[in-house]
């Protein structure tokens, strides 16, 4: 990213570029991305996934502010599109659902994130043993209800396993590490595009539940 940014700076200092990022768990076979090794806060981290996504957005904000023709900081932010991610259900449907909900909350409370796209709506044989799809699994309802303001959705998302799977003893989202979390309703205060990608006839097509 730094090399590309430097070239753009040389070519056109006012060029408005943004970032598309795939914050998969490492390795891909793991579901509990918050326990991945080599993932920590700070620019010295070995890997960036959803757990420390703010390392990426903070770095971009600090090092690559949008500037006008005179080189002055405009105060505007670049944005990040999380254009592909997904979590394996091989470690349990419930854990996959918790990982998806947790990562969506992390994305939703990060003001630089403007899109959150799921890799697979259905399991794809081309992915081998990963089983990243959500159709017919707990993760489908988690994704469907995570930012739905209806009473049904709110009740569904209050299932405590969404928190305790991430941190034992947690009593709510406020007990997890979600930068910027303030308890506000995502659907009311955040506007974030979401869809799944369905593999069909050798192309990926958008599908919204």
What do these predicted ranges mean?
Residues 91-208:
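Aromatic-rich peripheral "rim/lid" segments of glycoside hydrolase catalytic domains that contact
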Residues 1-94:
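Noncatalytic carbohydrate-binding groove/subsite architecture in carbohydrate-active enzymes
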